[in-house]
């Protein structure tokens, strides 16, 4: 089954990513596991840039119980990329970030995926309510689930 390919217009926050030589695998393209590092980068940069999140000192942190990625076309060093970010689901203590990886200048995504965070107390690891500053930042990039590639997942 062929998935519809997401386009830039469906994402609300973008962060540049430069591929590195060691991102490539023996087959000459970015290895599948590296995409998850790209996902983590755009999510955390959004939190730092837009919610004032301090990953080193925050009392609540996001832990990741679930990720997923669909690969649409290969990416390889030295491609310059942009990661697009939106929020597909925002709960009391959890959020599902939806991410697309674009080769710089391309309208269609090379890869799409999602990344779930559950916010927990840094020490106890018990779920906590998403703080107001973080929630406000997240609400600005929430999308209608109907338009999401991952709406049924």
What are these regions (language model features)?
Residues 2-45, 49, 153:
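Catalytic strand-loop segment that frames the active site of acyl-thioester-processing enzymes
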Residues 28, 37, 61-62, 108, ...:
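Residues that recognize and position ribonucleotide moieties
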Residues 46-95, 109-110:
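Hydrophobic beta-strand-centered segment that forms part of the acyl-chain substrate-binding groove
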Residues 21, 25, 58, 123-125:
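Residue-level signal for pocket-adjacent positions within structured domains
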Residues 23, 29-32, 65, 73, ...:
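Generic structural "secondary-structure junction" signal
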Residues 16-20, 70, 116:
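Generic structural detector for well-ordered beta-strands
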Residues 1-13, 75-77, 88-153:
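HotDog/MaoC-like acyl-thioester-processing domains
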């Amino acid at each position: 089954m062929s998935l519809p390919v997401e386009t830039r217009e469906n994402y609300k926050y973008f962060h540049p990513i430069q591929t590195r030589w060691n991102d490539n695998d023996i087959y000459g393209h970015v290895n599948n596991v590296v995409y998850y590092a790209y996902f983590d980068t755009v999510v955390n940069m959004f939190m730092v840039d837009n919610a004032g999140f301090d990953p080193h000192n925050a009392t609540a942190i996001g832990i990741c119980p679930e990720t997923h990625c669909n690969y649409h076309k290969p990416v390889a060093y030295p491609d310059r990329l942009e990661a697009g970010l939106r929020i597909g689901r925002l709960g009391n203590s959890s959020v599902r970030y939806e991410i697309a990886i674009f080769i710089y200048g391309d309208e269609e995504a090379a890869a799409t995926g999602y990344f779930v965070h559950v916010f927990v107390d840094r020490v106890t690891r018990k779920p906590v309510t998403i703080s107001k500053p973080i929630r406000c930042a997240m609400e600005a990039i929430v999308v209608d689930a109907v338009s999401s590639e991952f709406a049924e997942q």
